[in-house]
């Protein structure tokens, strides 16, 4: 559920279910300057003509009026900041909050914070909080190193997924060597995994790659 998704022909992801509801979407889009910086603010809400549809059941919507979707963004010097929020239709309490911060100058830094209330979706049993971090550095014209981590803030910052990637490249080819360490919630009965992958791309010849996987746990 978000501002952009409200305008989609189908608000459901995947092809399992059809978005079988006619609706009206109304809102406000505005941009303004504050301290010589541009801010964009978008708000919308939908009115579904039918209750209890495939989509409204998925997002726990019990009335014809949807929750309120809010989107805001600005760029200050080299920093880009975005907010994507879902507010309860009746009490204006937050159900979903997404904050992202991007910096791309001498280094690449991306921070994504998400919190979702258990009432936001039909299949959720508990609140969630997570923080995604991506950090990259171009060493020279032919080498780049990057790492990423997805942390479960509800479980003592336990990492759900971590990766380290080294890229070697020139004008017509690229070699990626990656290490990926994944941890899963036991509710899904999935085992942790560690993967080392090597992939090679070359212009005009397409793609060649292989993965070496070891499950150590």
Task: Please tell me what each predicted stretch does.
Residues 1-217:
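Outer-membrane beta-barrel translocator/pore domains, especially the C-terminal barrels
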């Amino acid at each position: 559920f978000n501002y952009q998704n409200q305008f989609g022909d189908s608000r459901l992801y995947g092809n399992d279910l059809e978005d079988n509801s006619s609706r009206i979407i109304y809102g406000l889009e505005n941009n303004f300057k504050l301290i010589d910086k541009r801010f964009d603010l978008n708000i919308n809400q939908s009115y579904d003509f039918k209750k209890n549809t495939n989509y409204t059941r998925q997002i726990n919507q019990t009335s014809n009026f949807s929750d309120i979707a809010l989107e805001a963004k600005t760029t200050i010097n080299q920093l880009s900041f975005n907010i994507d929020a879902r507010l309860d239709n009746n009490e204006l309490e937050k159900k979903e909050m997404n904050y992202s911060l991007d910096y791309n100058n001498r280094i690449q830094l991306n921070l994504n914070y998400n919190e979702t209330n258990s009432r936001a979706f039909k299949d959720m049993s508990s609140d969630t909080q997570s923080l995604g971090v991506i950090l990259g550095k171009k060493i020279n014209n032919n080498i780049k190193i990057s790492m990423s981590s997805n942390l479960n803030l509800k479980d003592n910052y336990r990492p759900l997924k971590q990766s380290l990637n080294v890229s070697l490249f020139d004008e017509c080819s690229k070699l990626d060597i990656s290490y990926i360490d994944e941890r899963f919630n036991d509710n899904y009965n999935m085992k942790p995994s560690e993967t080392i992958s090597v992939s090679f791309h070359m212009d005009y010849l397409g793609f060649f790659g292989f993965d070496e996987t070891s499950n150590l746990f």
